């Protein structure tokens, strides 16, 4: 499940393996 702005691939997972919010949406990290 992707949570947050869908402008980039999921870079972070919670302990359940779900996408977590990516506040650097649209930026290279």
Swiss-Prot record:
Disulfide bonds join 7-19, 10-25. Keywords: Disulfide bond, Glycoprotein, Nematocyst, Secreted, Toxin. It is found in: Secreted; Nematocyst. One of its GO terms (molecular function) is toxin activity. The keyword Lipoprotein does not apply. Glycans are attached at residue 1. Its main location: secreted. GO terms for cellular component: extracellular region; nematocyst. The keyword Disulfide bond applies. Belongs to the sea anemone BBH family. Negative results: does not inhibit voltage-gated potassium channels rKv1.1/KCNA1, rKv1.2/KCNA2, rKv1.3/KCNA3, rKv1.4/KCNA4, rKv1.5/KCNA5 rKv1.6/KCNA6, Shaker IR (with inactivation domain removed), rKv2.1/KCNB1, hKv3.1/KCNC1, rKv4.3/KCND3 and hERG. This is U-homostoxin-Hdu1a. The lineage of its organism: Eukaryota, Metazoa, Cnidaria, Anthozoa, Hexacorallia.
């Amino acid at each position: 499940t992707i949570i947050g702005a869908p402008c980039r691939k999921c870079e972070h997972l919670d302990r359940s393996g779900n996408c977590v919010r990516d506040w650097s949406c649209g930026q290279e990290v």
